[in-house]
């Protein structure tokens, strides 16, 4: 069947794979005499592996490498075909596969360019040049000569040919390659964009499964991270991975070019052994990416180029509007070619699939061309800000700015607000500065400027922006804007210790003015809505100060739908109530309220910042309730469009994940996200986040037994000034004190007890219980009675764990501590469970309770493998099982005799008997049957 191709007709007869014998061309190496050249001359060979720099994308392609390796080492297989789009790493993968075979394999690289189909023996020309004249007389002789030459060069080693083609290869080369494959002279790794770019005979081989296709696509985000680790050689921040993946769409070639450009520009920096970004990615002037885009640009039609120009400037356009400007066929063809993507929303937004193309093309366009495109899309009318989504506003404002045109005051104000919502403070400041003092939008613009400064951790500048508003200007605005300005000022003053005490007077004055304006009006009257905003600021101030207990009745009234029809006020008050309940010992009530708010939050999507506020407070609620796994899930969620915000939000997400891990006792797992978060926060500080990162990292290192590093970060924490909300400050304090306790600092233990007493007096029972639980690893009876009393004011499984630990430790009851450990295990609090089991071992042995001692010791033995540094060791003198004792115990528990165990482990029977004696003593068992399930 292989004789159907043109290549087959050239040779007259090419047998099927099973019919290769005397009738076929000789595969014996010839003696070339004078016509030969030294081995390797003119050949592109790789016999000693590929330089690591050429295999930078290989770490993300391990599954593909395994498929290729299997195809090249299977007897029936003739090789593999690697297909995929431009830049996905086909050639890199082929080189990595060849290098993986090692020096015992002879490799030969062939290349065929776009014009290769028109040149006989095009990809074999350098082999053809080595043939003696006697073998140049006919295609058959050439085929025989090249086959034997390859066999001779391989010198008895397996041979792999890498055929890298960007287009079709000529029929003569195809025939020779087919002969080489079917005679077993070599196997092949063919690299092509599509199967159709290969000779027809290769299609038959694929159909018969003599060749295996490995189809490559762009990298997913996890693979992008693996490639970045390979390229950069150090940890990489989550924001770096997400931003780069979003920019290049997972294309490895573009990813490498982007890394090179960003390192040269200084935006990609190594901070404390973590690669991260200084600022947003800007591709203007990126030479290597520019070359890649120009190469692709040259192959597109003029109509396609114009659509690309439009989308480069506008970022996205509604499908109906785009097809009104350009041919629908052109748009459809571009979508089929993978240039465009169309979302599923009602607007059917169209954008460039590969964002880097828009960035680069936009940098080519002159101001005049940008204005021409903008005029064509707008048709002489500017859009209304109220009708635009946040992302749409940002795109339009950026386009207008790039055209060096003026934004209308209304659009500049809306863009500043959108930039704050998208955590882009620099753009927010630039848009707010466009407004003049004479514009009626100037006062609200100052609010957004203050919010942007707060995001940059510059509260002094934020307050200055608000203080610039004169009293006459403040008196001239409406009641709602007045309330927003007061709320913004109160928010800024929270972060300035010398100003925080003035907030009650500020809010009281605002309430007096609004009460006069309200009269007997009810919501939705503007004055009532304004009064609600000021009341909300009062709750925020009290929550920031930790005054939770006293304001719960007021919050419950504000959060009651029957009493409060104002959705915005009600939902935000509910979020504060959720935190207040959590801190005052009503953890289960807080979790119930959290679920209810989570189900209603979509109905309040118009409330700016509500989702972020809810996520932040829900994290603390879950953390203090011991639900650390749900904390990880919460911060791991990323809504659509998140990559645009990642430089400002990734650090917070990684910090939150690290905090969840250290609260669970998993210091080792916490270090990666915490170190990454610190690297970003040291470049872009965000309020109290850097102090939180230092404290959590110190605790993580202490939990893993690395006292030197723990003390280093405790020192950094002490040298870093700052102010935080009550909940954040208490988490920082808790992490620092517990780190000190792990390091054996008696003052840290005393600090935890004092903190617990202060919290208890203030009604903050949750933090009191958590602090005292950490302080009483070696507590007194009085400590345990207090811990038990505090647990009685709390709700939920973590409170019950505290109560059982206190009761079991005070009464020295092993069974109570076993119950506490089992409950801690349901929360996956390994360090707390280990504490329970260590105490249970001691108390059970003191009481002669062999069953409880055996159960606790077995569980402690398992935990020793996961808890790097146990919080407490049994004091009864019996250490944990050694690795060899554990191995012998497992074998004995499975029924193996002492002699069988000795033979398997290569030791004497006497040694086995001695180890088993130690195992029985430590675990309190008397027979081998008791070992089953314990070890």
Predicted ranges, named:
Residues 54-69:
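N-terminal pre-P-loop "Q-motif" helix
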Residues 119, 305, 345-349, 387-394, ...:
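Alpha-solenoid helical repeat architecture
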Residues 1-4, 10-53, 58, 79, ...:
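C-terminal non-catalytic interaction modules
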Residues 46, 57, 88, 92-159, ...:
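Conserved phosphate-binding/catalytic loops and adjacent sensor/switch elements of nucleotide-binding enzymes
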Residues 103, 198-200, 205-207, 236, ...:
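Internal alpha-solenoid helical repeat scaffolds
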Residues 74, 132-137, 152-155, 187, ...:
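Helix-loop-helix "sensor" segment of P-loop NTPases
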Residues 79, 93-97, 329-330, 349-351, ...:
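Extended alpha-helical scaffolding segments used for macromolecular assembly and cargo binding
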